[in-house]
Amino acid sequence: MPQDQHLGVDKAKILIEALPYIQRFSGKTLVVKYGGNAMTDPELESSFARDIVLLKTVGLNPIVVHGGGPQVDSFLKQLGRESDRIDGMRVTDEATMEVVEMVLGGSVNKSIVNLINKHGGRAIGLTGQDGNLLRARKLLMEKQEEDGSIKHIDLGMVGEVTGVKTDVLEMFTQSDFIPVIAPLGVDEKGNTYNINADLVAGKVAEALGAEKLILLTNISGVLDENKNLLTGLTTQEVDRLIETGVIYGGMIPKVGCALDAVKGGVVSAHIVDGRVPHATLLEIFTDHGVGTLISNRTQTTH
């Protein structure tokens, strides 16, 4: 068989492998948190946008929630300013909040929208302020002191999601738009808050009863004590890995977000290596995926 026919057969096999997943997930909603290297590497940016457009084209309803911490840091540096962080959370005063709103709700959001549209999609940019999409309240971080007492730390204009206006999102997805959400929420008094994008994605997925929550990261997924990738975990197994210290440090918030989403009704959550081109498609439409799947039941395929 000529080489070009071999390549054609290989491509056909890939499509056949994807077919049952396309059929199973047609009409389903998935929420993708977009951040990390996938937002800063031009090749990965392009592959992500094409993945999202393909998902919409084959009948799924993707919703994108994006981060943008490095872009905010870069803009603050240009202004000769820095913002402190406590356990990875940005301390956000009013002046910093103005920059966060401008960068996340402006340049970063519009860049993602334009990229998806460039590849044939119909993306529409939103923040949590639009239509009161994301209701929020001030977040007080809890930190345990050496004596065991709990200290509450004020991070400024940092918030947590208290509600999601699902009708706003459903209006757009039912009209074949792809919502792209900046992680900014608003309280009843009109105060705007900077919210962790992972947490926003998880709450949006919960509120919509999404089929999948996909968190694109700069790691391969959840690793065991020997640093081997765990491709499938139940919520009970995740709880045990946290209790035994296998999951620790900076992974706990991300895994906790996925865990909360599944316990809140999302069918499965995926922690995926966003450094891999087309990671979103590979995780959804192939048998083994490229990350860790977390669900309420044991699964060997994605």
Curated annotation (Swiss-Prot):
SUPFAM superfamilies: Carbamate kinase-like (SSF53633). Belongs to the acetylglutamate kinase family. ArgB subfamily. It catalyses: N-acetyl-L-glutamate + ATP = N-acetyl-L-glutamyl 5-phosphate + ADP. One of its GO terms (biological process) is L-arginine biosynthetic process. It is found in: Cytoplasm. Catalyzes the ATP-dependent phosphorylation of N-acetyl-L-glutamate. Its main location: cytoplasm. CDD domains: AAK_NAGK-C. GO terms for cellular component: cytoplasm. Pathway: Amino-acid biosynthesis; L-arginine biosynthesis; N(2)-acetyl-L-ornithine from L-glutamate: step 2/4. The keyword DNA repair does not apply. Substrate binds at residues 68-69, 90, 194. HAMAP family: ArgB. Keywords: Amino-acid biosynthesis, Arginine biosynthesis, ATP-binding, Cytoplasm, Kinase, Nucleotide-binding, Transferase. Its EC number is 2.7.2.8. This is Acetylglutamate kinase. Pfam families: AA_kinase. It is an enzyme of class 2 (transferase). The lineage of its organism: Bacteria, Pseudomonadati, Pseudomonadota, Gammaproteobacteria, Moraxellales. GO terms for molecular function: acetylglutamate kinase activity; ATP binding. The record marks 33, 254 as: Transition state stabilizer. The keyword Chaperone does not apply.
